[in-house]
């Protein structure tokens, strides 16, 4: 009788843990990049001017907070047929080089997304922006189109490129 009760309980506990462990080893990754005719400093300035996001950013349509390690941001995304607000924690903020944050859905381990922006100096006042995200968590294998963000990343990259290049010409 006890085995009849414990077997379903064990399955309910083991399956989510196993799926979570699997996604830690096999995360879902999204990566985009674009070359920009602007210095890494100018790209960083545009990327971290959160107050201006509503003017130009088609993906992260608003962002509040400070780009500093440990800070909590409030970001509102547009895409996949709707909007979503989330509050990631900044993991890295190196001016002209890297901005990285960790966002979580509901609680740690359900769906975790580590989002990053890397800025590479190509010389001659040019940069490469790499934007990506690594998704892990128990629901990642079942999230389907909810994690299809590559088009949103690419749209943001193109808009950031246009804004940074325009700002670079004004200097």
Language-model features: where?
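A conserved amphipathic terminal alpha-helix motif
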Residues: 2-9, 13, 128-171
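Extracytoplasmic/periplasmic/luminal assembly and interaction segments
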Residues: 50-92
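A generic helix-loop boundary/linker signal
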Residues: 33, 63, 80, 109, ...
